[in-house]
Every structure is written in C-alpha cells, then in structure tokens.
C-alpha cells in the first residue's frame, strides 16, 4: 500500500509540474541602444528561440515552437532606441510583442517584420510612447510594420508609425484594434492595409498624411467565408467599427476601402463618411463547387428582385447578396 501511495504521489507531482509549465509565461527582452541590441533569452526556452544576429541592432530571431511542441506563448519585450535597426521574427506559433518604450527606424526596410502566420498580439505597455519608421523600398516588405499573421493591437500605450515607401501597417490577415492609441503619421501608400477583415472595438486610431487609402481591406483568398461568429477564421473583406475613435485626414484615396461591407455600430467616426468605398469583385459570384445556379451558396439579386447568374459580369449598381443565411448590400462601381 505504501509503495502504491508513493507511486501515485509521484505521478500527481509530475502532472502538477507539467501543468505549471504549460501556463508559465516566458519573456525574451530586446534592448536597443544605437547600433547594438542586447537580446536576453531565458534558459528555459533557449531551445525554442535563437538569436541569429548577435548584438546587432538588426535583430533577427527564430522561434521553433509549434502547436504540439512549445513552452507556451512567449512574450518579446522591445525597448530602447535605434536609428538603424529592425526586429525581424520568424516562427510558427502565436506570440506577443510588447512595445515598452521603443523608438526604432530601419533605413533599409521594415522596422518590424513578423513572418509568423499565427495570432500576433502587439501590446503597447501602459503610458509608453513607441515609434516605428522605415527607409528605402524593399521588395520583401509591404509596410513599416509588416506581419504575416492575425494582428491584434492592444494595450494602454501609444504607437506612432510611418512609412516612406509603402503602407504604414500591413497585415496579411486580419487586424483588430482595442484600447491602445495608434497614430499613423504618414505613408507612401495606405495607412493600414490588411486582408480578411478589420475590426476596431475601442481605443484611438488617427491616420494622417497617407498618399493612398486610410484603411484598405482585401480578401486573403478568392473564396469568401461570409460573416462568422466572433469573426474567427473570417475572410469577408469587411470593415467593422463598434467602438473607439477613428480619425482620418489628409489622404490621397478613400478614407476606407473594402472588398466587402463597411459597418459602423458604435464609436466616433471623425472623417468624411462619404469618402468610403465598399464593393465586391466578380470573384464573389464564382461558385465554390460545381453546383448550378439554383444550388450556388452565393445568390445575387438586383433591386428588382431578379437573380443574377453566378458567372455574370455585373454592371454598376446596387445588389443584394444572400450567403450562408445572411443578407447584405453590395455596390458595384
């Protein structure tokens, strides 16, 4: 009996240790100072994170974590100042980037480039001001802040960002904004350019002095999902604003341009709401399968109630789209 009790106790202790490790949070710190940066990686995660560029201010980190082998989500805390540096990150697992009083400029490319298709949380530490800027054009970069994954901006601090050659903020997937303050102070192209959808629920977003659109939302794939519950895995090309304050001024294009719909359900719209463009490309009419018109999951009608063929090239006008039990308006311009 005593042997059984000891064995059981050992198993329970092992399980508790494993559970504690799965919930433990590890932080990698990156402190910029001119042309150098000190990267500190905790020993416990040294097998998952590699510093590829030594003490250079052009920081390049590789995270080998995967969905099945990982120490939990890792936080990357960035602070300090460099007029000739960058943060280049490659990984395959969700991560958090904490901006903790950072001023970072890269004269050659993006200030921040994240090659990770998972959820990327960008948190501004409370009461901090963080500034990102870029330099000359780089064929691999589409923005001063360039992210491959789902980009969620949050926190109680401020982020200032500008681009001299492309978009200020570029995300290959969706962008969400809450709580934080983001100031786009200039861009050669769009202020924010993203795919899938854009959602602002709180916080403050100010876009000024961009040469193209304030915010542009595209599809990630040619096939739309329509609106999904909680927007998870949504690929609609839609823009949503339910709270916060959005200011857009001094631009060369539309304040907001989407391939889906634009929906304001709350917040303050401090821009010309007539200078917006929402439309669907003809790709929305392409069937997802080989179904005929009667079975097509996307149904499009004109204002006279006439059903449009799924492969039709629509003329300018307003149409009603029915998909997945939902109905929305589509404007062809």
Regions found by a protein language model. Give the residues of each.
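Bacterial Sec-dependent N-terminal signal peptides
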Residues: 19-20, 305
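Detector for intrinsically disordered, low-structure N-terminal pre-sequences
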Residues: 10, 27, 297-299
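C-terminal outer-membrane/trafficking sorting elements
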Residues: 285-333
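Hydrophobic h-region of N-terminal signal peptides that target proteins for export
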Residues: 9-18
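Sec-dependent signal peptide recognition
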Residues: 2-8
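A detector of low-complexity, intrinsically disordered, Ser/Thr/Gly/Pro/Ala-rich segments
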Residues: 5, 38, 280, 287-288, ...
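A composition-driven surface/loop motif
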Residues: 20-282
């Amino acid at each position: 009996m005593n042997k059984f009790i000891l064995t059981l106790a050992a198993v329970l202790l092992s399980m508790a240790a494993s559970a504690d490790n799965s919930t433990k949070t590890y932080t990698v710190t990156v402190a910029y100072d001119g042309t150098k940066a000190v990267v500190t990686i905790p020993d416990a995660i040294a097998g998952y994170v590699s510093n590829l560029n030594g003490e250079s201010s052009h920081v390049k980190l590789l995270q080998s974590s995967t969905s099945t082998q990982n120490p939990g989500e890792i936080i990357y805390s960035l602070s300090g100042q460099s007029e000739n540096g960058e943060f280049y990150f490659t990984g395959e697992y969700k991560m958090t980037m904490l901006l903790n009083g950072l001023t970072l400029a890269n004269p050659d490319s993006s200030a921040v480039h994240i090659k990770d298709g998972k959820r990327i949380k960008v948190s501004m530490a409370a009461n901090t001001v963080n500034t990102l800027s870029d330099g000359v054009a780089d064929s691999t970069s589409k923005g001063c802040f360039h992210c491959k994954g789902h980009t969620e901006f949050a926190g109680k601090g401020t982020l200032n960002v500008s681009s001299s050659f492309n978009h200020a903020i570029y995300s290959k997937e969706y962008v969400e904004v809450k709580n934080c303050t983001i100031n786009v102070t200039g861009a050669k192209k769009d202020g924010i350019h993203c795919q899938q959808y854009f959602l602002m629920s709180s916080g403050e977003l100010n876009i000024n002095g961009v040469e193209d659109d304030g915010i542009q939302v595209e599809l990630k794939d040619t096939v739309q999902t329509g609106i999904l519950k909680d927007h998870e895995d949504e690929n609609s090309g839609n823009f949503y604003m339910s709270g916060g304050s959005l200011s857009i001024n001094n631009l060369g294009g539309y304040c907001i341009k989407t391939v889906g719909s634009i929906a304001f359900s709350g917040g303050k719209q401090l821009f010309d709401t007539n200078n917006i463009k929402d439309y669907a490309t003809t790709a929305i009419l392409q069937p997802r399968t080989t179904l005929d018109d009667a079975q097509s999951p996307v149904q499009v009608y004109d204002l006279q109630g006439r059903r449009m063929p799924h492969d039709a090239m629509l003329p300018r006008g307003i149409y009603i789209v029915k998909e997945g039990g939902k109905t929305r308006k589509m404007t062809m311009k």
